[in-house]
Amino acid sequence: QRPLSASWTVTGSGAFLVGKKKSRVRISGVTIGKIVDYGLKDSQNMGACMAPAACDTILQNLMDFGRGEKDYDRIITGDLGYVGQSILFDLLRKKGLDIKENHMDCGMTIFDQQTQHTNSGGSGCGCAAITLAAYIMPQLISGEWKRILFVPTGALMSTVSFNEGESVPGIAHGIVLEHC
């Protein structure tokens, strides 16, 4: 039986063109993340492994741009899932931030947990890509959302590192997208 912390791989892809022509959505800032390793070794709980990196990137973005969490319509993580989201909230709360009102996680959005029984939610790079393409970008294009912080998350592991019992570090980069 799969643990409740396990996630389901999302099969999908997304591609975006970045150019000089004026568009209805622009990239107005980027925060390069760093590898964060809390020493967790459970590959069935990648949300917990990635949450510290997401926390670090969100905090760094807010500091770099002189913003607060309310300056974004949404702060969107890639695939932390239900378990990782809870850890992210705890880590941010310890730093004095509360993003519960405007946080969204692609791994939690992509599936219906009640009817599809997906444990912690969806995972994988396709999860963030298709949610950005099919759900987030239309919100920005229409102007329903004016500014978001998109923080896709990643777990750095391989079959070799797993078999050797290594920890699973996380990484997350931040992209500020704005309606224009």
Put a short name on every predicted segment.
Residues 80-95, 160-167:
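Short glycine/threonine-rich loop-to-helix capping motif typified by GTGT followed
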Residues 128-129, 134-164:
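Internal helix-turn-beta structural module
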Residues 94-131:
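Conserved catalytic cysteine-centered active-site region
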Residues 41, 45-52, 75, 79, ...:
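A short glycine-/small-residue-rich loop at the edge of a beta-strand within enzyme catalytic domains
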Residues 13, 50-57, 68-71, 84-88, ...:
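General structural feature for long, well-ordered alpha-helical segments within catalytic domains
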Residues 8, 15-21, 123-143:
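Active-site-proximal alpha-helical scaffold in enzymes
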Residues 71-78, 149:
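Short glycine-rich phosphate-binding loop at a beta-alpha junction
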Residues 1-59, 64-67, 101-108, 147-153, ...:
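Condensing-enzyme catalytic core mediating Claisen C-C bond formation in acyl metabolism
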